[in-house]
Amino acid sequence: MPTDPFAKFPARATVTTAAGGHLVSIAYGWEHPDDGPQDGLVVIGPADDGDSLVALWGDSWHQKPTPMTLSGSRGAGATLELEGEYGGGWRWRVRFDATDPDTFRMQMDNVIPDEHATAEVAAGPYPVMIMQTGRA
């Protein structure tokens, strides 16, 4: 939840292209402070309109056991933002940033719907994982 403290652990990500360069695959690993090593996979490609993106995402801790479909777009520089609803207005927002030539950044936000906001917890996105890795 938004009030949970962040924990710092090693993380890794491998970015590859597939299907003649039309798809990007991002396999990543991270560690949960209580539940140990976790991993995930995002496969991203162009949507039918050519400007938007569509993705399939699965994560051993955040999004399991059924993979989730995300949609989104390219942002400024070498950034992508994807989002999808997983129930009752709750959404995941996943952002990737490869703008810096030395680092790769991934951030997962959980988005709280307005109807679930309280005096203590505001509606809107809050970060649940921020990963920054060096690039090989």
Indicate residue ranges for each PLM-predicted region:
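Hydrophobic small-molecule pocket/channel-lining residues, especially in calycin-type beta-barrels
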Residues: M1-A136
